Amino acid sequence: MPSRFDFFSGPGERPFTPRLARLARGVAGLAALTLFVAAAGLPAREVARAGELDAVYARHGNNMPVITNDGDLAVYEGDPGEPAVDCAGLAGPRTMVALVFGQSNAANTVDRGYDATLPVYSWHDGQCKRVHDALPGASSANGSTWSRLGDRIVTSGLYDAVLFVDIARGGSSILNWGAKGGLRALLVETLGALRENGLAPTHVFFHQGEADCYLGLSGKEYASVLQDVLGEVRSRVGEGCDIFVSRASLFLDPVCGDRQSPVCYKSCPAIVAAQTAAADPGTRIFSGPNTDLLVPWFDRNDGYHFTSRAADRFAAAWMPLLVRGETSVPTLH
């Protein structure tokens, strides 16, 4: 997951705010936020949540990855020779519309070589096109799990067609997608554009966590930002959309660096526990696959990203979860 600001770089290679100054700013920010929300008449629980979120950014915000749009992290714009199809013709109860976001393993970092053959489409920049391997709109230009999953969904009869909207960004932390992160705007703008085009998401797939394991977020801190992200998504997709939170934290420790050695791989059970605890079937939030278990270290092509074999397994693992969480088309707010 190389980038100008690579969260797999050693701590000595990153700028840090002096501890006391950062703490002072964080305390001041918390106090100001508490006064503001109290004055606004928000419930005590919301005041507490806002304070917790502010504390996470006060502690980790200076180490938030900087997401670039160049090199291996450039957004794939799609094959210019692939003709666009009528997006309006895809809308309907027999089409799954799935928003995908998170970090690199939800983007286009899988080994190349899979060509979707059934009615599987992507939406990017207002255009719908047939999907072959990589999905336009996500970072990198290799292969994708989602083209594989799309074929499986159509083959199963769960839906007649699948439209993926993939905005995953390699190297991103949940902090980037949270209230104070630069990718929040991308998330909100994408959902707004889908609404304007009459493409209400039926599903949302979130796969992310490796960056935050490296950054050292605690389970409680991760849960605080995840709750904020899920709340934002729910407010924009409506109550009928199924939201899936994958479990993911495993990464190759760059201090060790030997991708052939299992001892060089680290995971964060507390982050995985926070991802699992986010599930609430009563509100249509479900657990996705646990890729820490599903994709072991030897099935990662560069120490981080899924091999084609792992992507096949990841796609297959979604199917029983989707059947359990099957939904009708919701109404966007």
State each model region's role.
Residues 31-39:
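Hydrophobic core
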Residues 9-12, 20, 40, 209:
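Prokaryotic Sec-type signal peptides and long signal-anchor helices
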Residues 13-32:
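N-terminal Sec-pathway targeting helices
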Residues 25, 38-333:
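Cell-envelope and extracellular/periplasmic
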